[in-house]
Amino acid sequence: MLDSDSIDLILKDLKTHDFVFIALHGSFGEDGVIQSILSKNNIPFNGSNEESSRNCFNKSVTKDIVMNQGILSPKYYHTSSNICNDHIDFNSEKYIVKPNSQGSSVGFNVVDNFENLNDAIDIALDFDTSVLIEEFIDGREITVPILEDEPMPVIEIEPKSGIYDYKSKYTAGESRYICPAVLNDDKYLFVQDCALSIHKMLKCDVYSRVDFKFYENNFYFLEINTLPGMTETSLFPMAAKKHGFS
């Protein structure tokens, strides 16, 4: 954990540089904290500002903003307790349980029946103070990178397990990626436009990656990543390469 002395030492070093490229994931990196520190010290950095980063890292806040604009998203319940079964007002064949503010699918679980929700909630609460319980939407995993207010090639993700969890994201060979995704022209352009609209309504800057499920001819917004991964196997560079960037 960083204390104030550690932050002061880091800032002293950062101030000797012209620009800071943030390549952090999870808390401190994606939740607006480092963005706030850099902004207050007039240090330029990549990506979205403090407010946008904070809102986008908080999944329930993100969903509320997006759903209030009429965009489809899985029904959900936000809680800080595992005693919540009586309060969930939607039925689902399965349930997605995940920390409300985390990344990389840490603490993520798919629950096959209502009775097993509590165990999954306990796991998610190990990683955050609150949990999102979502309706399970079966369908194709679709993601749209955005760069400078322009949608990049759409990518479809095919996890071998059928669920795009931590293992599917970070273990070689566990997922197949199709870029560009095979969609008819109307749907392809629609999901690009939808992703760009979400990027703008959440006041993201420079770049982001917007995730969807495609089911029964509809796209359901899942979440947005304001600091997409930039490794050789990450999705954003894959789309950028297809778009013509070296």
Regions found by a protein language model. Give the residues of each.
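Active-site nucleotide/adenylate-binding loops and adjacent lid/helix of ATP-dependent enzymes
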Residues: 10, 14-15, 55-140
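A glycine- and small-aliphatic-rich helix-loop capping segment at beta-alpha/alpha-beta transitions
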Residues: 36-45, 113-118, 243
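Conserved metal-phosphate-binding beta-hairpin within the catalytic cores
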Residues: 135, 199-232, 240
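Phosphate-binding site of ATP-dependent enzymes
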Residues: 112-193, 214-220
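Short, intrinsically disordered, charge-balanced linker/junction segments flanking boundaries
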Residues: 1, 74, 243-246
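ATP-binding N-terminal substructure of ATP-dependent carboxylate-amine bond-forming enzymes
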Residues: 1-51, 55-57, 61, 80-87
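A short, polar/charged loop-to-alpha-helix boundary motif
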Residues: 162-168, 231-239
